[in-house]
Amino acid sequence: MESLRKSSRSTKGKNTYLEVLRRQEEEEYEQRVNRPKKEKVQEIVHCSPCGTTDANYVEDEDPYGEMIQCDQCDTWQHINCMLQVKDIKVPKELENSDDVDSLSKLLVNSEDKYYCDRCIYKSQLREERRAYKELNKSEMIGDNDILDEPKEHPDEYVDDQDEDQDFILSKDTANIAEVDDDEFVENDDNRVKKDKRKRKPSNSAITTTKTVPKKKARVITDDQTETETIPSEDSYAKVRTNARKMLVTLFKNYIIPDTLKNNVFEIVKGHDEQSISDEFAEEMESKLFSHCRSISNYKTLISVYTEKVRVLFSNLKDPKNLSLKEAVINRQLDLEQLVSMSATDLANPDLQSMKKKIDSQKIDSLVIPNQPLDKLKQDNSEDDHNSFEFTNPTFTKTFNPKDIHESNSNNRPYTTDSPTNSYTDEPDSMKSDSNNGVDTNDQNILNVKFKLDYNEVDLNVVGTFKFLGSTLLDENQEHKIYQAVVGDGKLIYEGRLHTKIATEYISEIKTTRAVLAYQLLPSASHREKYEQLVEFMDDLDRVLGMKPRKPYVKNMYILSSLLGKLPDILQILTTDESIAKKRIDLSRINDNDKTLYLVVVVKPEIV
Protein backbone atom coordinates (compact mmCIF):
# COMPACT_ATOMS: atom_id res chain seq x y z
CA MET A 1 0.00 0.00 0.00
CA GLU A 2 1.38 3.32 -1.06
CA SER A 3 2.01 5.92 1.63
CA LEU A 4 -0.06 9.09 1.58
CA ARG A 5 1.62 12.32 0.57
CA LYS A 6 1.80 14.73 3.50
CA SER A 7 2.56 18.45 3.66
CA SER A 8 5.19 19.77 6.00
CA ARG A 9 4.01 23.43 5.79
CA SER A 10 3.59 25.09 9.17
CA THR A 11 0.89 27.42 7.78
CA LYS A 12 -1.31 24.61 6.58
CA GLY A 13 -5.02 25.49 6.86
CA LYS A 14 -4.38 29.23 7.21
CA ASN A 15 -5.03 32.04 4.69
CA THR A 16 -2.67 34.94 5.35
CA TYR A 17 -4.62 37.25 3.05
CA LEU A 18 -7.83 36.79 5.03
CA GLU A 19 -5.92 37.29 8.27
CA VAL A 20 -4.63 40.66 7.04
CA LEU A 21 -8.15 41.76 6.07
CA ARG A 22 -9.49 40.72 9.45
CA ARG A 23 -6.81 42.70 11.30
CA GLN A 24 -7.52 45.78 9.17
CA GLU A 25 -11.21 45.60 10.00
CA GLU A 26 -10.44 45.34 13.72
CA GLU A 27 -8.12 48.34 13.56
CA GLU A 28 -10.70 50.43 11.71
CA TYR A 29 -13.37 49.50 14.23
CA GLU A 30 -11.11 50.52 17.14
CA GLN A 31 -10.40 53.84 15.45
CA ARG A 32 -14.10 54.53 15.04
CA VAL A 33 -14.87 53.64 18.63
CA ASN A 34 -12.02 55.70 20.04
CA ARG A 35 -12.61 58.66 17.72
CA PRO A 36 -13.15 61.87 19.73
CA LYS A 37 -16.64 63.35 19.61
CA LYS A 38 -17.24 66.27 17.31
CA GLU A 39 -17.09 69.69 18.84
CA LYS A 40 -20.31 71.55 19.24
CA VAL A 41 -21.29 73.62 16.24
CA GLN A 42 -20.27 77.21 16.63
CA GLU A 43 -23.20 79.46 17.32
CA ILE A 44 -24.04 81.74 14.40
CA VAL A 45 -26.10 84.92 14.30
CA HIS A 46 -28.31 85.12 11.20
CA CYS A 47 -31.41 87.31 11.45
CA SER A 48 -32.81 87.79 7.95
CA PRO A 49 -35.34 90.63 8.61
CA CYS A 50 -32.81 93.09 10.05
CA GLY A 51 -29.75 91.69 8.27
CA THR A 52 -27.76 91.00 11.44
CA THR A 53 -24.95 88.44 11.06
CA ASP A 54 -21.75 87.49 12.85
CA ALA A 55 -19.89 90.08 10.79
CA ASN A 56 -21.89 93.09 12.08
CA TYR A 57 -23.26 91.81 15.40
CA VAL A 58 -22.05 93.48 18.59
CA GLU A 59 -23.86 92.18 21.65
CA ASP A 60 -23.53 95.31 23.80
CA GLU A 61 -24.56 97.68 20.99
CA ASP A 62 -27.33 95.60 19.40
CA PRO A 63 -30.53 97.75 19.29
CA TYR A 64 -32.97 94.93 18.45
CA GLY A 65 -33.15 93.24 21.83
CA GLU A 66 -32.86 89.61 22.93
CA MET A 67 -32.40 86.63 20.62
CA ILE A 68 -33.73 83.10 20.31
CA GLN A 69 -31.93 80.07 18.85
CA CYS A 70 -33.42 77.89 16.11
CA ASP A 71 -33.74 74.23 17.13
CA GLN A 72 -32.92 73.02 13.60
CA CYS A 73 -30.05 75.13 12.22
CA ASP A 74 -28.74 76.48 15.59
CA THR A 75 -28.68 80.07 14.34
CA TRP A 76 -29.83 83.05 16.40
CA GLN A 77 -32.55 85.57 15.53
CA HIS A 78 -34.06 88.57 17.30
CA ILE A 79 -37.32 87.77 19.04
CA ASN A 80 -38.95 91.03 17.94
CA CYS A 81 -37.92 90.45 14.31
CA MET A 82 -39.41 86.96 14.25
CA LEU A 83 -42.66 88.16 15.83
CA GLN A 84 -43.02 90.67 12.99
CA VAL A 85 -42.06 88.20 10.25
CA LYS A 86 -44.51 85.55 11.47
CA ASP A 87 -47.12 88.27 12.12
CA ILE A 88 -47.75 87.12 15.70
CA LYS A 89 -49.84 89.46 17.79
CA VAL A 90 -48.22 90.34 21.11
CA PRO A 91 -50.61 90.63 24.08
CA LYS A 92 -50.94 94.10 25.53
CA GLU A 93 -49.44 93.02 28.85
CA LEU A 94 -46.24 91.91 27.05
CA GLU A 95 -45.83 95.03 24.92
CA ASN A 96 -42.61 96.88 25.81
CA SER A 97 -41.82 94.03 28.20
CA ASP A 98 -38.40 92.52 28.87
CA ASP A 99 -39.82 89.12 29.79
CA VAL A 100 -37.81 87.01 27.32
CA ASP A 101 -39.37 83.70 28.36
CA SER A 102 -42.94 84.89 27.77
CA LEU A 103 -42.07 86.41 24.38
CA SER A 104 -40.19 83.27 23.34
CA LYS A 105 -43.23 81.09 24.08
CA LEU A 106 -45.12 82.98 21.37
CA LEU A 107 -42.65 81.65 18.77
CA VAL A 108 -42.53 77.97 19.75
CA ASN A 109 -44.87 75.32 18.34
CA SER A 110 -46.94 72.68 20.09
CA GLU A 111 -43.81 70.53 20.56
CA ASP A 112 -42.04 73.41 22.32
CA LYS A 113 -39.70 73.80 19.34
CA TYR A 114 -38.73 77.04 17.62
CA TYR A 115 -37.84 77.15 13.92
CA CYS A 116 -36.58 80.23 12.11
CA ASP A 117 -38.18 81.61 8.95
CA ARG A 118 -35.59 79.97 6.69
CA CYS A 119 -36.10 76.49 8.14
CA ILE A 120 -39.90 76.81 7.89
CA TYR A 121 -39.62 77.84 4.24
CA LYS A 122 -37.26 74.96 3.45
CA SER A 123 -39.61 72.51 5.18
CA GLN A 124 -42.59 73.72 3.15
CA LEU A 125 -40.53 73.61 -0.05
CA ARG A 126 -39.46 70.02 0.61
CA GLU A 127 -43.04 69.00 1.33
CA GLU A 128 -44.23 70.69 -1.86
CA ARG A 129 -41.53 69.03 -3.97
CA ARG A 130 -42.32 65.67 -2.43
CA ALA A 131 -45.97 66.10 -3.34
CA TYR A 132 -45.09 67.09 -6.91
CA LYS A 133 -42.76 64.10 -7.21
CA GLU A 134 -45.40 61.68 -5.96
CA LEU A 135 -47.98 63.19 -8.29
CA ASN A 136 -45.68 62.89 -11.32
CA LYS A 137 -44.78 59.33 -10.37
CA SER A 138 -48.39 58.31 -9.96
CA GLU A 139 -49.26 60.05 -13.23
CA MET A 140 -46.74 57.88 -15.05
CA ILE A 141 -47.98 54.72 -13.36
CA GLY A 142 -51.61 55.66 -14.01
CA ASP A 143 -50.98 56.29 -17.69
CA ASN A 144 -49.23 52.96 -18.11
CA ASP A 145 -52.15 51.16 -16.51
CA ILE A 146 -54.80 53.01 -18.46
CA LEU A 147 -53.23 53.06 -21.91
CA ASP A 148 -52.03 49.47 -21.60
CA GLU A 149 -48.55 50.43 -22.76
CA PRO A 150 -45.81 47.83 -23.19
CA LYS A 151 -43.32 47.59 -20.36
CA GLU A 152 -40.21 47.97 -22.47
CA HIS A 153 -39.12 51.43 -23.58
CA PRO A 154 -38.93 52.40 -27.26
CA ASP A 155 -35.62 52.11 -29.03
CA GLU A 156 -33.53 55.23 -29.33
CA TYR A 157 -33.79 57.14 -32.58
CA VAL A 158 -30.39 57.33 -34.27
CA ASP A 159 -29.60 59.17 -37.48
CA ASP A 160 -26.92 57.15 -39.28
CA GLN A 161 -25.91 60.08 -41.45
CA ASP A 162 -25.37 62.42 -38.54
CA GLU A 163 -21.80 62.72 -37.36
CA ASP A 164 -22.86 63.95 -33.94
CA GLN A 165 -24.97 60.83 -33.28
CA ASP A 166 -28.16 62.65 -32.40
CA PHE A 167 -30.65 60.77 -30.29
CA ILE A 168 -33.83 61.46 -28.44
CA LEU A 169 -33.71 60.74 -24.74
CA SER A 170 -35.90 57.96 -23.47
CA LYS A 171 -36.65 57.36 -19.80
CA ASP A 172 -33.73 54.95 -19.55
CA THR A 173 -31.21 57.46 -20.90
CA ALA A 174 -32.53 60.60 -19.27
CA ASN A 175 -29.82 60.65 -16.58
CA ILE A 176 -26.72 60.10 -18.70
CA ALA A 177 -23.78 61.91 -17.14
CA GLU A 178 -22.18 63.06 -20.42
CA VAL A 179 -23.74 66.32 -21.55
CA ASP A 180 -24.26 66.85 -25.27
CA ASP A 181 -26.27 69.51 -26.98
CA ASP A 182 -28.54 66.84 -28.47
CA GLU A 183 -29.78 65.61 -25.10
CA PHE A 184 -32.06 68.51 -24.38
CA VAL A 185 -35.27 66.88 -25.64
CA GLU A 186 -37.43 65.32 -22.97
CA ASN A 187 -39.87 62.55 -23.87
CA ASP A 188 -43.27 63.10 -22.35
CA ASP A 189 -44.50 60.36 -20.04
CA ASN A 190 -47.91 60.62 -21.66
CA ARG A 191 -46.80 59.46 -25.09
CA VAL A 192 -48.10 56.11 -26.27
CA LYS A 193 -45.08 53.92 -26.98
CA LYS A 194 -44.84 51.65 -30.00
CA ASP A 195 -44.37 47.98 -29.37
CA LYS A 196 -41.14 47.34 -31.26
CA ARG A 197 -40.10 43.74 -31.68
CA LYS A 198 -36.64 42.64 -32.76
CA ARG A 199 -36.37 40.32 -35.72
CA LYS A 200 -34.45 37.11 -35.28
CA PRO A 201 -31.88 36.32 -38.00
CA SER A 202 -32.84 33.44 -40.23
CA ASN A 203 -30.50 30.50 -40.54
CA SER A 204 -30.56 28.84 -43.94
CA ALA A 205 -28.57 25.87 -42.62
CA ILE A 206 -31.48 24.79 -40.45
CA THR A 207 -33.75 22.62 -42.49
CA THR A 208 -36.22 21.58 -39.84
CA THR A 209 -39.09 23.92 -39.22
CA LYS A 210 -41.40 24.15 -36.30
CA THR A 211 -45.05 24.52 -37.06
CA VAL A 212 -46.78 27.20 -35.07
CA PRO A 213 -50.48 26.73 -34.53
CA LYS A 214 -52.61 29.55 -35.84
CA LYS A 215 -54.58 31.63 -33.43
CA LYS A 216 -58.27 31.07 -33.54
CA ALA A 217 -60.28 33.91 -34.92
CA ARG A 218 -62.36 35.82 -32.44
CA VAL A 219 -66.04 35.26 -33.05
CA ILE A 220 -68.50 37.92 -32.01
CA THR A 221 -72.12 36.90 -31.78
CA ASP A 222 -75.04 39.16 -32.53
CA ASP A 223 -75.67 39.90 -28.88
CA GLN A 224 -72.02 40.78 -28.23
CA THR A 225 -70.17 43.90 -29.26
CA GLU A 226 -66.45 44.50 -29.29
CA THR A 227 -65.73 47.42 -26.98
CA GLU A 228 -62.61 49.02 -25.58
CA THR A 229 -61.56 48.10 -22.09
CA ILE A 230 -62.41 51.05 -19.87
CA PRO A 231 -60.21 51.29 -16.75
CA SER A 232 -61.76 50.81 -13.36
CA GLU A 233 -61.82 53.32 -10.53
CA ASP A 234 -58.95 51.48 -8.81
CA SER A 235 -56.56 52.44 -11.61
CA TYR A 236 -56.97 56.13 -10.66
CA ALA A 237 -56.51 55.60 -6.91
CA LYS A 238 -52.77 56.33 -6.81
CA VAL A 239 -52.88 59.63 -8.67
CA ARG A 240 -55.98 60.81 -6.81
CA THR A 241 -54.40 60.07 -3.43
CA ASN A 242 -51.33 62.13 -4.30
CA ALA A 243 -53.51 64.95 -5.60
CA ARG A 244 -55.38 65.04 -2.28
CA LYS A 245 -52.04 65.26 -0.46
CA MET A 246 -51.10 68.27 -2.58
CA LEU A 247 -54.41 69.97 -1.88
CA VAL A 248 -54.06 69.32 1.86
CA THR A 249 -50.63 70.99 1.71
CA LEU A 250 -52.15 73.88 -0.25
CA PHE A 251 -54.83 74.61 2.34
CA LYS A 252 -52.68 73.91 5.40
CA ASN A 253 -49.55 75.86 4.40
CA TYR A 254 -50.90 78.64 2.18
CA ILE A 255 -54.63 79.33 2.09
CA ILE A 256 -55.47 79.05 5.81
CA PRO A 257 -52.33 80.86 7.12
CA ASP A 258 -52.70 83.72 4.60
CA THR A 259 -56.39 84.26 5.33
CA LEU A 260 -55.84 84.11 9.09
CA LYS A 261 -52.96 86.56 8.77
CA ASN A 262 -55.17 89.10 6.96
CA ASN A 263 -58.15 88.59 9.32
CA VAL A 264 -60.50 87.39 6.57
CA PHE A 265 -61.08 83.93 8.05
CA GLU A 266 -61.60 82.51 11.53
CA ILE A 267 -61.36 78.90 12.65
CA VAL A 268 -64.55 77.70 14.28
CA LYS A 269 -64.30 76.08 17.70
CA GLY A 270 -63.94 72.34 17.53
CA HIS A 271 -61.95 72.49 14.29
CA ASP A 272 -58.27 72.94 13.55
CA GLU A 273 -56.19 73.63 10.45
CA GLN A 274 -55.62 69.94 9.72
CA SER A 275 -59.30 68.96 9.83
CA ILE A 276 -60.32 71.93 7.68
CA SER A 277 -57.58 71.15 5.16
CA ASP A 278 -58.61 67.50 4.94
CA GLU A 279 -62.27 68.39 4.46
CA PHE A 280 -61.63 70.96 1.72
CA ALA A 281 -59.04 68.79 -0.05
CA GLU A 282 -61.33 65.76 -0.23
CA GLU A 283 -64.31 67.76 -1.51
CA MET A 284 -62.23 69.77 -3.98
CA GLU A 285 -60.51 66.69 -5.39
CA SER A 286 -63.84 64.95 -5.92
CA LYS A 287 -65.26 67.96 -7.80
CA LEU A 288 -62.06 68.28 -9.84
CA PHE A 289 -61.99 64.64 -10.89
CA SER A 290 -65.65 64.76 -11.94
CA HIS A 291 -65.01 67.91 -13.98
CA CYS A 292 -61.95 66.43 -15.75
CA ARG A 293 -63.86 63.24 -16.52
CA SER A 294 -66.63 65.27 -18.17
CA ILE A 295 -64.24 67.15 -20.50
CA SER A 296 -61.90 64.30 -21.51
CA ASN A 297 -61.90 60.65 -22.45
CA TYR A 298 -60.29 57.85 -20.46
CA LYS A 299 -57.07 58.06 -22.49
CA THR A 300 -56.38 61.72 -21.68
CA LEU A 301 -58.06 61.87 -18.27
CA ILE A 302 -54.86 61.42 -16.24
CA SER A 303 -52.90 64.12 -18.09
CA VAL A 304 -55.76 66.65 -17.98
CA TYR A 305 -56.41 65.90 -14.31
CA THR A 306 -52.78 66.30 -13.17
CA GLU A 307 -52.26 69.51 -15.14
CA LYS A 308 -55.41 71.00 -13.60
CA VAL A 309 -54.13 70.12 -10.11
CA ARG A 310 -50.88 71.95 -10.83
CA VAL A 311 -52.68 75.02 -12.19
CA LEU A 312 -54.93 75.26 -9.12
CA PHE A 313 -52.00 74.72 -6.76
CA SER A 314 -49.77 77.39 -8.34
CA ASN A 315 -52.51 80.06 -8.51
CA LEU A 316 -53.97 79.46 -5.05
CA LYS A 317 -50.46 79.42 -3.60
CA ASP A 318 -49.80 82.93 -4.98
CA PRO A 319 -49.52 85.43 -2.07
CA LYS A 320 -51.11 88.14 -4.25
CA ASN A 321 -54.23 86.06 -4.83
CA LEU A 322 -55.77 86.77 -1.43
CA SER A 323 -59.24 87.55 -2.78
CA LEU A 324 -59.51 84.12 -4.40
CA LYS A 325 -58.27 82.41 -1.22
CA GLU A 326 -60.84 84.30 0.84
CA ALA A 327 -63.65 83.30 -1.52
CA VAL A 328 -62.61 79.64 -1.40
CA ILE A 329 -62.04 79.23 2.34
CA ASN A 330 -65.26 81.10 3.25
CA ARG A 331 -67.20 79.11 0.62
CA GLN A 332 -68.21 82.27 -1.21
CA LEU A 333 -67.06 80.53 -4.39
CA ASP A 334 -68.48 77.12 -5.10
CA LEU A 335 -65.75 74.48 -5.48
CA GLU A 336 -67.47 73.09 -8.55
CA GLN A 337 -67.15 76.50 -10.19
CA LEU A 338 -63.55 76.84 -8.96
CA VAL A 339 -62.30 73.65 -10.62
CA SER A 340 -63.85 74.69 -13.96
CA MET A 341 -62.16 78.12 -14.05
CA SER A 342 -59.40 78.73 -16.60
CA ALA A 343 -55.85 79.76 -15.75
CA THR A 344 -56.64 83.36 -16.73
CA ASP A 345 -59.59 83.52 -14.33
CA LEU A 346 -57.49 81.98 -11.54
CA ALA A 347 -54.66 84.52 -11.93
CA ASN A 348 -54.12 87.19 -9.28
CA PRO A 349 -55.76 90.64 -9.73
CA ASP A 350 -52.50 92.30 -10.83
CA LEU A 351 -52.12 89.98 -13.81
CA GLN A 352 -55.79 90.30 -14.72
CA SER A 353 -55.71 94.11 -14.58
CA MET A 354 -52.56 94.14 -16.68
CA LYS A 355 -54.27 91.98 -19.29
CA LYS A 356 -57.31 94.28 -19.35
CA LYS A 357 -55.03 97.29 -19.70
CA ILE A 358 -53.26 95.77 -22.68
CA ASP A 359 -56.58 94.86 -24.31
CA SER A 360 -57.93 98.38 -23.80
CA GLN A 361 -54.76 99.89 -25.27
CA LYS A 362 -55.18 97.75 -28.36
CA ILE A 363 -58.78 98.91 -28.75
CA ASP A 364 -57.79 102.57 -28.27
CA SER A 365 -55.01 102.25 -30.83
CA LEU A 366 -57.45 100.95 -33.45
CA VAL A 367 -57.93 103.64 -36.12
CA ILE A 368 -61.16 103.62 -38.14
CA PRO A 369 -60.92 105.64 -41.38
CA ASN A 370 -63.39 108.51 -41.76
CA GLN A 371 -63.50 108.33 -45.55
CA PRO A 372 -65.94 105.89 -47.17
CA LEU A 373 -64.59 102.78 -48.79
CA ASP A 374 -63.32 103.20 -52.32
CA LYS A 375 -65.74 102.07 -54.96
CA LEU A 376 -65.43 101.32 -58.63
CA LYS A 377 -66.86 103.51 -61.33
CA GLN A 378 -67.46 102.76 -64.96
CA ASP A 379 -65.86 104.84 -67.74
CA ASN A 380 -67.99 106.42 -70.46
CA SER A 381 -66.76 103.96 -73.06
CA GLU A 382 -69.19 101.71 -74.90
CA ASP A 383 -67.56 98.54 -73.61
CA ASP A 384 -68.70 97.80 -70.06
CA HIS A 385 -65.44 95.98 -69.35
CA ASN A 386 -63.11 98.46 -70.97
CA SER A 387 -61.37 99.80 -67.84
CA PHE A 388 -62.05 100.60 -64.20
CA GLU A 389 -60.30 102.95 -61.80
CA PHE A 390 -60.45 103.94 -58.13
CA THR A 391 -62.25 107.15 -57.21
CA ASN A 392 -59.59 107.86 -54.58
CA PRO A 393 -56.97 110.15 -56.23
CA THR A 394 -54.16 108.32 -54.45
CA PHE A 395 -54.84 105.30 -56.65
CA THR A 396 -54.23 106.23 -60.28
CA LYS A 397 -53.49 102.81 -61.70
CA THR A 398 -55.98 101.50 -64.26
CA PHE A 399 -56.79 97.82 -64.05
CA ASN A 400 -57.06 95.41 -66.94
CA PRO A 401 -60.43 93.67 -67.32
CA LYS A 402 -58.65 90.31 -67.18
CA ASP A 403 -57.55 91.10 -63.64
CA ILE A 404 -61.15 91.70 -62.64
CA HIS A 405 -62.34 88.42 -64.14
CA GLU A 406 -59.65 86.63 -62.11
CA SER A 407 -60.69 88.25 -58.84
CA ASN A 408 -61.90 84.98 -57.33
CA SER A 409 -58.51 83.27 -57.66
CA ASN A 410 -56.60 86.30 -56.38
CA ASN A 411 -58.93 86.92 -53.39
CA ARG A 412 -59.77 90.46 -54.54
CA PRO A 413 -62.88 91.97 -52.91
CA TYR A 414 -64.56 92.96 -56.18
CA THR A 415 -66.88 91.32 -58.71
CA THR A 416 -67.72 92.08 -62.34
CA ASP A 417 -71.43 91.34 -62.37
CA SER A 418 -72.43 94.96 -61.76
CA PRO A 419 -69.40 97.26 -62.06
CA THR A 420 -71.08 100.32 -60.63
CA ASN A 421 -72.23 98.88 -57.30
CA SER A 422 -70.31 95.64 -57.07
CA TYR A 423 -68.29 96.03 -53.88
CA THR A 424 -68.45 92.88 -51.79
CA ASP A 425 -67.14 91.94 -48.39
CA GLU A 426 -63.72 90.33 -48.06
CA PRO A 427 -63.49 86.54 -47.93
CA ASP A 428 -63.25 84.82 -44.59
CA SER A 429 -59.60 83.96 -45.13
CA MET A 430 -58.68 87.65 -45.52
CA LYS A 431 -60.81 88.56 -42.52
CA SER A 432 -59.01 86.06 -40.34
CA ASP A 433 -55.64 87.47 -41.35
CA SER A 434 -56.68 91.06 -40.70
CA ASN A 435 -58.15 90.19 -37.33
CA ASN A 436 -54.88 88.65 -36.27
CA GLY A 437 -52.68 91.44 -37.57
CA VAL A 438 -51.29 89.32 -40.42
CA ASP A 439 -50.26 91.27 -43.48
CA THR A 440 -50.69 89.03 -46.51
CA ASN A 441 -48.13 91.13 -48.39
CA ASP A 442 -45.51 90.70 -45.67
CA GLN A 443 -42.47 88.99 -47.18
CA ASN A 444 -41.67 87.39 -43.82
CA ILE A 445 -44.90 85.34 -43.87
CA LEU A 446 -44.18 81.82 -45.14
CA ASN A 447 -46.40 80.39 -47.84
CA VAL A 448 -47.04 77.27 -45.77
CA LYS A 449 -49.41 76.95 -42.80
CA PHE A 450 -48.35 75.33 -39.56
CA LYS A 451 -50.40 72.58 -37.92
CA LEU A 452 -49.65 71.62 -34.34
CA ASP A 453 -51.39 68.54 -32.90
CA TYR A 454 -50.94 68.39 -29.12
CA ASN A 455 -53.16 65.38 -28.52
CA GLU A 456 -52.03 64.86 -24.90
CA VAL A 457 -54.17 67.82 -23.83
CA ASP A 458 -56.49 67.78 -26.86
CA LEU A 459 -55.22 71.04 -28.38
CA ASN A 460 -54.87 71.35 -32.17
CA VAL A 461 -53.75 74.70 -33.56
CA VAL A 462 -53.44 75.95 -37.15
CA GLY A 463 -51.86 79.21 -38.30
CA THR A 464 -49.02 80.88 -40.20
CA PHE A 465 -45.25 81.11 -39.80
CA LYS A 466 -43.60 84.53 -39.60
CA PHE A 467 -39.83 84.44 -40.03
CA LEU A 468 -37.90 86.65 -37.57
CA GLY A 469 -34.30 85.91 -38.57
CA SER A 470 -31.33 83.72 -37.70
CA THR A 471 -27.87 83.62 -36.11
CA LEU A 472 -24.50 82.42 -37.48
CA LEU A 473 -25.89 82.19 -41.03
CA ASP A 474 -25.09 84.43 -43.99
CA GLU A 475 -27.83 85.65 -46.30
CA ASN A 476 -27.42 82.82 -48.81
CA GLN A 477 -27.60 80.10 -46.14
CA GLU A 478 -30.57 81.77 -44.47
CA HIS A 479 -32.48 82.14 -47.75
CA LYS A 480 -31.72 78.51 -48.57
CA ILE A 481 -33.18 76.87 -45.46
CA TYR A 482 -35.49 79.32 -43.64
CA GLN A 483 -38.55 77.75 -45.30
CA ALA A 484 -37.17 74.27 -45.87
CA VAL A 485 -36.69 73.55 -42.14
CA VAL A 486 -40.46 73.66 -41.52
CA GLY A 487 -41.25 71.38 -44.48
CA ASP A 488 -44.97 71.04 -45.02
CA GLY A 489 -45.69 72.93 -41.78
CA LYS A 490 -46.73 69.92 -39.72
CA LEU A 491 -45.19 70.17 -36.25
CA ILE A 492 -44.84 66.71 -34.72
CA TYR A 493 -44.88 66.83 -30.91
CA GLU A 494 -42.20 64.79 -29.10
CA GLY A 495 -42.18 65.93 -25.48
CA ARG A 496 -41.94 68.73 -22.91
CA LEU A 497 -38.79 70.29 -21.50
CA HIS A 498 -38.29 72.67 -18.58
CA THR A 499 -37.76 76.23 -19.79
CA LYS A 500 -34.65 76.64 -17.63
CA ILE A 501 -32.99 73.57 -19.18
CA ALA A 502 -33.80 74.74 -22.70
CA THR A 503 -32.41 78.21 -21.94
CA GLU A 504 -29.19 76.72 -20.56
CA TYR A 505 -28.89 74.58 -23.68
CA ILE A 506 -29.23 77.58 -26.01
CA SER A 507 -26.65 79.46 -23.92
CA GLU A 508 -24.17 76.61 -24.38
CA ILE A 509 -24.56 76.20 -28.15
CA LYS A 510 -25.23 79.82 -29.14
CA THR A 511 -21.75 80.28 -30.68
CA THR A 512 -21.50 76.87 -32.41
CA ARG A 513 -25.02 76.20 -33.64
CA ALA A 514 -27.17 78.40 -35.84
CA VAL A 515 -30.69 79.24 -34.66
CA LEU A 516 -33.68 80.30 -36.77
CA ALA A 517 -36.59 82.05 -35.07
CA TYR A 518 -40.26 82.23 -36.10
CA GLN A 519 -43.46 83.64 -34.64
CA LEU A 520 -46.49 81.34 -34.85
CA LEU A 521 -49.64 83.33 -35.64
CA PRO A 522 -52.99 81.54 -35.20
CA SER A 523 -55.91 81.55 -37.58
CA ALA A 524 -59.11 83.19 -36.34
CA SER A 525 -60.91 79.88 -35.82
CA HIS A 526 -58.06 78.49 -33.69
CA ARG A 527 -57.26 81.57 -31.59
CA GLU A 528 -59.05 80.26 -28.47
CA LYS A 529 -57.14 76.97 -28.44
CA TYR A 530 -53.97 78.87 -29.30
CA GLU A 531 -54.34 81.06 -26.19
CA GLN A 532 -55.18 78.00 -24.07
CA LEU A 533 -51.91 76.41 -25.19
CA VAL A 534 -49.95 79.56 -24.28
CA GLU A 535 -51.49 79.59 -20.79
CA PHE A 536 -50.90 75.86 -20.39
CA MET A 537 -47.18 76.15 -21.26
CA ASP A 538 -46.70 79.25 -19.12
CA ASP A 539 -48.29 77.61 -16.07
CA LEU A 540 -45.99 74.59 -16.40
CA ASP A 541 -42.94 76.70 -17.30
CA ARG A 542 -42.21 74.29 -20.14
CA VAL A 543 -41.26 74.40 -23.82
CA LEU A 544 -42.50 71.86 -26.38
CA GLY A 545 -40.01 69.73 -28.31
CA MET A 546 -40.81 69.07 -31.96
CA LYS A 547 -39.43 66.31 -34.17
CA PRO A 548 -36.72 67.55 -36.59
CA ARG A 549 -37.63 67.13 -40.26
CA LYS A 550 -34.20 67.68 -41.87
CA PRO A 551 -30.82 65.97 -41.29
CA TYR A 552 -29.10 69.28 -40.46
CA VAL A 553 -31.72 70.21 -37.82
CA LYS A 554 -30.70 69.43 -34.24
CA ASN A 555 -33.73 70.49 -32.19
CA MET A 556 -36.99 72.39 -32.57
CA TYR A 557 -38.60 74.14 -29.59
CA ILE A 558 -41.90 75.99 -29.24
CA LEU A 559 -41.77 78.83 -26.68
CA SER A 560 -44.67 80.63 -25.00
CA SER A 561 -45.00 84.33 -24.23
CA LEU A 562 -47.60 85.86 -21.92
CA LEU A 563 -48.41 89.58 -21.62
CA GLY A 564 -45.94 90.48 -24.36
CA LYS A 565 -42.86 89.32 -22.45
CA LEU A 566 -40.03 88.16 -24.71
CA PRO A 567 -38.84 84.61 -23.84
CA ASP A 568 -35.38 84.34 -22.29
CA ILE A 569 -34.12 82.29 -25.23
CA LEU A 570 -34.91 85.07 -27.71
CA GLN A 571 -33.36 87.64 -25.37
CA ILE A 572 -30.12 85.66 -25.38
CA LEU A 573 -30.12 85.31 -29.17
CA THR A 574 -30.69 89.04 -29.73
CA THR A 575 -28.56 90.68 -27.02
CA ASP A 576 -25.52 88.44 -26.51
CA GLU A 577 -22.47 90.13 -28.05
CA SER A 578 -20.61 86.82 -28.46
CA ILE A 579 -23.05 85.63 -31.14
CA ALA A 580 -21.90 86.35 -34.67
CA LYS A 581 -24.19 87.43 -37.53
CA LYS A 582 -27.22 88.18 -35.41
CA ARG A 583 -29.99 88.69 -37.94
CA ILE A 584 -33.06 88.22 -35.69
CA ASP A 585 -35.27 91.30 -36.09
CA LEU A 586 -37.62 91.79 -33.12
CA SER A 587 -39.44 94.59 -34.95
CA ARG A 588 -41.10 91.93 -37.11
CA ILE A 589 -42.98 90.49 -34.11
CA ASN A 590 -46.75 91.04 -34.10
CA ASP A 591 -47.86 92.56 -30.79
CA ASN A 592 -49.96 89.94 -28.99
CA ASP A 593 -50.32 89.44 -25.24
CA LYS A 594 -50.32 85.67 -25.86
CA THR A 595 -48.07 84.28 -28.55
CA LEU A 596 -45.91 81.30 -29.50
CA TYR A 597 -42.44 81.23 -31.02
CA LEU A 598 -40.55 78.48 -32.82
CA VAL A 599 -36.74 78.22 -32.59
CA VAL A 600 -34.88 75.76 -34.80
CA VAL A 601 -31.30 74.73 -33.96
CA VAL A 602 -29.28 73.71 -37.03
CA LYS A 603 -25.70 72.71 -37.87
CA PRO A 604 -24.31 75.53 -40.03
CA GLU A 605 -21.40 73.44 -41.28
CA ILE A 606 -23.64 71.05 -43.24
CA VAL A 607 -26.23 73.53 -44.50
Curated annotation (Swiss-Prot):
Protein's gene: BYE1
Tagged with keyword Lipid metabolism: no
ZnF (PHD-type) intervals: 44-122
Listed Low complexity bias regions: 388-399
Cellular-component GO terms for this entry: nucleus
Database matches in PROSITE patterns: TFIIS_CENTRAL (PS51321), ZF_PHD_1 (PS01359), ZF_PHD_2 (PS50016)
Protein name per the record: Transcription factor BYE1
Feature: compositional bias, Polar residues: 407-424
